[in-house]
Amino acid sequence: RLCWFCACHTQGTRTLSPVESYIETLEAELSLMRATIPSGLRMGRLHWGGGTPTILPPHLIHRLSRAIRAVFPAHDLFEFSVEIDPTMVDRAKIDALAAEGMTRASIGIQDFDPVVQAAIGREQPFAVTKACVDDLRAAGITSLNTDLVYGLPHQTLARIEDTIAKVLSFAPDRVALFGYAHVPWMSKRQKLIDESALPDDMARYTMATAAATLFADAGLTPIGIDHFARPGDTLDTALRTGQLRRNFQGYTADTCQTLIGLGASSISRFPAGYAQNAPATAAYIQRIEAGEFAGSRGYTLSDEDILRARAIELLMCNFRLDLAELQAEFGPRAAALTPVLEGIA
């Protein structure tokens, strides 16, 4: 299924055949990686997302995990997070993911109200989600992340408060609270959403602030602009120790500057810049089958880009900028931001 509110690159399928073929292409891309990367690299984090990895049956879960580990052996402090669709997972899939080392499950909830769910093309009953959470806990998955969205069609303060009460009953370790971005010119499926049912700016603000209060009252620590974490979670620890980071997926405790993306439309981050694979699945497969990487565009960061990116990250993580801190990291180059700091002081 394709949820109407999502602006990410996804593709629906009703049979397993294209999924199996896609796994073969991922294996081919990994083989190209093996022949290119330096020896001795170890993987600290692994994330399966970009739709729902739980479309994979257990045998393909094992197959993909082993293919990745054959190229990128796991670090001692390895973390493995997986996006879970409660309507497309069962205990056998959860057990397979747990056997492959999954440490964190991430469940996209958005809103539990059936009126809101119908308006965004995503049916996900609370009872089904609770059963999924129970299975995850029973399988030994100790870290649970939930994603909520405010600003959805027909969403009201009462409805989002009811959703949050249900989410808190799961005792999540992390919560991400994102604002819905209505961009139908970028994501054609969003044209299925009734624009007249979208909350106005003041209603969005009221929902966001009320949600933040409810999470804080439940004992979760506010993390940056849109995340919350239980005390003792690695995000909470990273915030307190100055190690919190922000990437294009959200907040993270991972300070590594290298992120390697696999698959169609995936984005890789390196100390020197970014690279993205071909967004179209057919184009991605064609490039990999030709024995070449599928990169379609990239961006090389200048020294000033890196400095400004770090300054923005510090603001998003800590809500403050310290020139001395930037000088300790960048040396004399940090002085280039002095006019900016003076302007916002």
Describe the role of every protein-language-model region.
Residues Q327, I344-A345:
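C-terminal extensions of enzymes
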Residues R1-T10:
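Local cysteine-cluster metal-coordination motifs and their immediate loop/turn environment
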Residues T10-T36, L41-P332:
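C-terminal scaffold of the Radical SAM
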Residues P332-G343:
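Short amphipathic alpha-helical interaction segments
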